[in-house]
Every structure is written in structure tokens, then in C-alpha cells.
């Protein structure tokens, strides 16, 4: 929905992230990007009706991930919002919206789980999707670190494992990419689809290391979980 790389004509790119999660149990957004105008423009280009969304999961409170939230809530006020900040949760509730802060691992819908908030310099939470007996981790920027994020995800996952990682990895250099790949390989990650704050150099390195397990990502990318 939103990324700094667009893969299809007619879709706008911008620094930020938003991923549509469309499952039988729930239709939701993982992050919302920097502006509602951008989000709505890409949704319309993709023939997606934002009023059909049931929930929004915010990984962390940086503007490039949460900037569109107020506009989206004005457009679709029935949304349930999962926030990493309990104080903001109270503010949203007082404004009449349904909001929740999941400090600990929890199930959101059938096959959908939250890792709980990883506290640190930048508080962040990851979303887990279980499909075909495999767990996929969605990550906004992985500010806590890929090791810490995966440890939390493995703990929260019904499979006690993570098969695929999709999202921003906050990796810039080749050495960081190599270290991340080594750890992901160690814990059993077989598929990766990096975007947003993952540098072009890191993407290129990860593409070589993961080989057939690498999936190009960007606005317009569609990943069917039963095919990975």
C-alpha cells in the first residue's frame, strides 16, 4: 500500500510503510504510511475500499508509519486500532475510538497474533500471521534489532518459529545484511521480503543470500501466503 519503492505504474511511492493484510478472519492494515492522501490514492488505484477495513496495527509511532491514521479514522471511524503506546491508547479511547495496547503476546484474530511491545529507545511491536502451518512476521522498522524482533516473534508464534519476514529491517550496510542473514538462517527463516528502511545495498545482498527465498517488495506487491 505504501513504500518508498513502487512496482506498478499509477501507484505513488513515499518514505513510509503500509501493508494490507487480507485474511478470511480479518481485513486490516499494518501501519498506514505518512499521509492519508497517499494511502487513499493507492487504495483507489488498487480498487481497495478502506471503509471495509476492520483494524489497524501500528508498529511504532514514527510519522512515516502513523501519519495517515487520523485521516483514516475520519474516513472509517469503526476501525479498531492497536497501538504500541498505552497513553495514546487512552487518548484514542477518550476520543471515541476503539483502541488497544497489547503489552504482551496476544491473538488478534484467527491466525493473527501480536508479539507484544518491545520496549526500548523506540517502542515497537510486530504482527504475526499463521498460514499453511507457517508463521510470517511483519515488521515496521525492526528498531529493536532483527534478533530481538525474531526472539519475540518466535515466543509469540503458535509454531514457535518464523518462516518468513516481510517489512522494514533498518539495515544499511552489507555487513549488517550478512549478520542478519546468518541469524535468520540460524532460527529457520526461509523467505524474506524487505522494504522501506532496508537500503538498496542490503536488499541486493539479501537477495543473493536468500536466493529463491527472496521476494521483491514495494507498492503493488502482492504476496500470497500459501505460495511462499
Give the role of each language-model region.
Residues 1-45, 124-139:
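Conserved beta-strand hairpin/beta-sheet module of binuclear metal-dependent hydrolase folds
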Residues 37-82, 157-165, 185, 190:
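Active-site metal-binding motif and surrounding structural segment of the metallo-beta-lactamase
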Residues 1-11, 105-116, 170:
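Glycine-rich phosphate-binding "P-loop"
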Residues 83-125, 131-132, 215-228:
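Metallo-beta-lactamase
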Residues 27-28, 55, 79-80, 111-113, ...:
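Structural motif
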Amino acid at each position: 500500500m505504501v513504500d518508498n519503492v513502487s512496482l506498478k505504474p499509477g501507484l505513488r511511492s513515499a518514505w513510509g510503510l503500509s501493508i494490507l493484510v487480507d485474511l478470511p478472519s480479518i481485513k486490516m492494515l499494518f501501519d498506514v504510511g505518512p499521509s492519508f492522501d497517499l494511502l487513499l490514492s493507492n487504495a483507489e488505484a488498487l480498487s481497495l475500499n478502506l471503509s471495509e477495513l476492520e483494524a489497524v496495527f501500528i508498529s511504532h509511532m514514527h510519522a512515516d508509519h502513523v501519519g495517515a491514521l487520523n485521516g483514516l479514522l475520519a474516513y472509517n471511524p469503526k476501525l479498531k486500532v492497536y497501538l504500541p503506546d498505552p497513553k495514546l491508547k487512552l487518548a484514542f479511547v477518550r476520543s471515541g475510538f476503539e483502541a488497544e495496547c497489547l503489552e504482551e503476546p496476544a491473538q488478534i484474530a484467527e491466525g493473527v497474533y501480536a508479539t507484544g511491545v518491545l520496549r526500548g529507545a523506540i517502542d515497537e511491536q510486530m504482527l504475526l500471521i499463521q498460514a499453511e502451518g507457517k508463521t510470517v512476521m511483519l515488521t515496521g522498522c525492526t528498531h529493536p534489532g532483527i534478533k530481538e524482533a525474531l526472539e519475540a516473534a518466535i515466543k509469540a508464534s503458535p509454531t514457535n518459529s518464523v518462516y518468513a519476514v516481510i517489512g522494514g529491517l533498518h539495515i544499511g550496510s552489507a555487513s549488517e545484511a550478512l549478520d542478519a542473514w546468518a541469524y535468520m538462517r540460524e532460527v529457520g527463516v526461509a523467505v524474506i521480503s524487505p522494504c522501506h528502511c532496508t537500503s538498496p545495498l542490503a536488499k541486493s545482498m539479501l537477495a543473493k543470500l536468500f536466493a529463491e527465498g527472496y521476494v521483491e517488495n514495494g507498492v503493488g506487491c502482492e504476496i500470497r501466503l500459501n505460495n511462499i
